[in-house]
Amino acid sequence: MPKHGKKYLDAAKKVDSNKLYSVAEAMKLVKETSYANFDATIDVAYNLSVDPKQADQQIRGSIVLPNGTGKTQTVVVFAEGPQAEQAKAAGADFVGSDDLVEKIQGGWLDFDVVVATPMMMAKVGRLGRVLGPKGLMPNPKTGTVTMDIEKAVKNVKAGQVEYRVDRQAAIHTPIGKVSFTEDQLVENFDALRDVILRARPASAKGQYIKSVAVSATFGPGIKLDPLNLD
């Protein structure tokens, strides 16, 4: 068992580890138990009864949270011509082609999201070993490979988050900051819950959502009732 510091232990005392909290209770408690000296991120973790090894049970997508994430995302766009101009007009931080490929190959990674047109994916593909492990590779399922560059950039800037089931059949996604109101966190949680419920594979067996927990960057996990997420 890892050793926890005094701040964590003090925060953990406020959480009943045997209780499954309602969404409203959890959002109140996650704010109260954050002990960071900065505006910490609040994450939600879902554990699902899916088999990620099965192609038809891989869950992945993106959603623009109603209240954003509280974080300003730095967006890189691979595009040329009219799409490059769209990207700049929509607020992309860096727009280019071969020049960006070379820059990233040289070790530059000061960005959060990569968007590309389909025509540019042959070039972006050369960065697979760099972008892939960091979860930065553009993908049509998350709306980051598209001809509608303007919409993609605006969505990211408005607070779009990606959700993806990992090898342990879990989804980890940020839903806001400690500075958010409880209502804002509940609204963001509800929006993410709805898309995850809609994404249930037809072949998934048993209770789809096995467990749910929320936590701040520095704070204990708070378990929710997976059968009562309203």
Swiss-Prot record:
GO terms for molecular function: rRNA binding; structural constituent of ribosome; tRNA binding. Keywords: Repressor, Ribonucleoprotein, Ribosomal protein, RNA-binding, rRNA-binding, Translation regulation, tRNA-binding. One of its GO terms (biological process) is regulation of translation. GO terms for cellular component: large ribosomal subunit. Pfam families: Ribosomal_L1. PROSITE patterns: RIBOSOMAL_L1 (PS01199). CDD domains: Ribosomal_L1 (cd00403). Binds directly to 23S rRNA. The L1 stalk is quite mobile in the ribosome, and is involved in E site tRNA release. Belongs to the universal ribosomal protein uL1 family. Part of the 50S ribosomal subunit. NCBIfam families: rplA_bact. This is Large ribosomal subunit protein uL1. It comes from Lactobacillus acidophilus (strain ATCC 700396 / NCK56 / N2 / NCFM).
